[in-house]
């Protein structure tokens, strides 16, 4: 009976002029011009990690939140909370990590091969100034990790002279690339989709490998330098601050600039400086 009444009400509604409303509802989402709706995916690639929601900080963003590292199924029900507290303390970070992200200096952009894209004379001056600035901070730097690309290697060579005794490691993970399709898109830079697919996963791997809270065994604060590229740094900053990663191209970095991220033991992340070149004379600042 209820089903028959529903049919009668629907028939009355259509007869009364509600048909237009019904058809209008069906057409929602179709462009007025009659073409197909834009079906492009609006979600970022899976490797960027699922965001908890607008304005919600993911406390376990680096998968090192102590409680997430404990197998609660093995918890001893007799010792109860005391054992849980003890195990949590075992996994808790105690130290702060200071991450210094350095963009390489100006280089010859017209080199036909990557190995030919060496630093310009001005670029070498910029690297000297950056090295002097880092040395003047009076910090005990633990290590330098740098991209294996020529312009990053040469920048590292010069900066290292001002930081004697600091070990250095080369990695392909920090090489320049296209991390994720920027939003809004730009007309002057449009890599192939496969480049985002390949570079994006690699740069995300660099983020996961290098950007995280300190290991629980680390007793003292650390100061680490990463010398790489603008796209990589901008993407890392967005990911570390849990900003939409597709907004990376809205940031701008000068050559030889210093970006300082701080990762606290509780996983909180702060951006101390972004692209600082205030230590350079105005005529030495470039962004190529």
UniProtKB/Swiss-Prot annotation:
| Keywords (A to Z) from UniProt | Acetylation, Hydrolase, Membrane, Mitochondrion, Mitochondrion inner membrane, Mitochondrion outer membrane, Necrosis, Phosphoprotein, Transmembrane, Transmembrane helix
Residues annotated with N6-acetyllysine modification: 115, 143, 190
One Pfam family name is His_Phos_1
Q: What happens when the gene is disrupted?
A: Deletion mutant mice were born at mendel ratio, but weighed significantly less compared to the wild-type (WT) controls at 1-year and older. About 50% of the mutant mice (aged 1-1.5 years) showed lordokyphosis (hunchback), odd gait and swollen foot, and among them about 50% died from unknown causes. These suggest an accelerated senescence (or aging) phenotype in deletion mutant mice.
Q: Which residues cross the membrane?
A: 7-29
**Any one biological process term the GO annotation gives:** necroptotic process
What's its membrane topology? Single-pass membrane protein
Q: Which residues carry this modification: Phosphoserine?
A: 79, 86
The protein's matches in Gene3D superfamilies, at most eight in alphabetical order, are given as: Phosphoglycerate mutase-like
Major localisation: mitochondrion
Q: Which Enzyme Commission number(s) are listed?
A: 3.1.3.16
Q: Which InterPro entries match?
A: His_Pase_superF_clade-1, His_PPase_superfam, Mito_Ser/Thr_phosphatase
The UniProt function text for this chain reads: Mitochondrial serine/threonine phosphatase that dephosphorylates various substrates and thus plays a role in different biological processes including cellular senescence or mitophagy. Modulates cellular senescence by regulating mitochondrial dynamics. Mechanistically, participates in mitochondrial fission through dephosphorylating DNM1L/DRP1. Additionally, dephosphorylates MFN2 in a stress-sensitive manner and consequently protects it from ubiquitination and degradation to promote mitochondrial network formation.
* Known partners and oligomeric status: Dimer. Forms a ternary complex with NFE2L2 and KEAP1. Interacts with BCL2L1 and MAP3K5. Upon TNF-induced necrosis, forms in complex with RIPK1, RIPK3 and MLKL; the formation of this complex leads to PGAM5 phosphorylation. Isoform 2, but not isoform 1, interacts with DNM1L; this interaction leads to DNM1L dephosphorylation and activation and eventually to mitochondria fragmentation.
Q: What is this protein called?
A: Serine/threonine-protein phosphatase PGAM5, mitochondrial
Q: Which organism's genome codes for this protein?
A: Mus musculus
Organismal lineage? Eukaryota, Metazoa, Chordata, Craniata, Vertebrata
The gene designation is Pgam5
């Amino acid at each position: 009976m209820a089903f028959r009444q529903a049919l009668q009400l629907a028939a009355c509604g259509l007869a009364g002029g509600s048909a237009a409303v019904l058809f209008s509802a069906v057409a929602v989402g179709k462009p007025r011009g009659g073409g197909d709706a834009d079906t492009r995916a609006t979600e970022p690639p899976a490797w960027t990690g699922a965001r908890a929601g607008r304005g919600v900080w993911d406390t376990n963003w680096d998968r090192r939140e102590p409680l997430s590292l404990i197998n609660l199924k093995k918890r001893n029900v007799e010792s109860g909370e005391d054992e849980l507290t003890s195990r949590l303390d075992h996994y808790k970070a105690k130290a702060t990590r200071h991450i210094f992200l350095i963009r390489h200096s100006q280089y010859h952009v017209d080199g036909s091969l990557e190995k030919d894209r060496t630093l310009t004379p001005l670029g070498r001056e910029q690297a000297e100034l950056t090295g002097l600035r880092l040395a003047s901070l009076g910090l005990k730097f633990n290590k330098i990790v740098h991209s294996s690309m020529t312009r990053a290697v040469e920048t590292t060579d010069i900066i290292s002279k001002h930081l004697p005794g600091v070990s250095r490691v080369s990695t392909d993970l920090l090489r320049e690339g296209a991390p994720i399709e920027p939003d809004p898109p730009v007309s002057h830079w449009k890599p192939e989709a496969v480049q985002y697919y390949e570079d994006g996963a690699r740069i995300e791997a660099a983020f996961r490998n290098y950007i995280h809270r300190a290991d629980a065994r680390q007793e003292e604060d650390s100061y680490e330098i990463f010398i790489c590229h603008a796209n990589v740094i901008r993407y890392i900053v967005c990911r570390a601050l849990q900003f939409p990663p597709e907004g990376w191209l809205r940031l701008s970095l000068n050559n030889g600039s210093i970006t300082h991220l701080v990762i606290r033991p509780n996983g909180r992340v702060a951006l101390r400086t972004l692209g600082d070149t205030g230590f350079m004379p105005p005529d030495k600042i470039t962004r190529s």
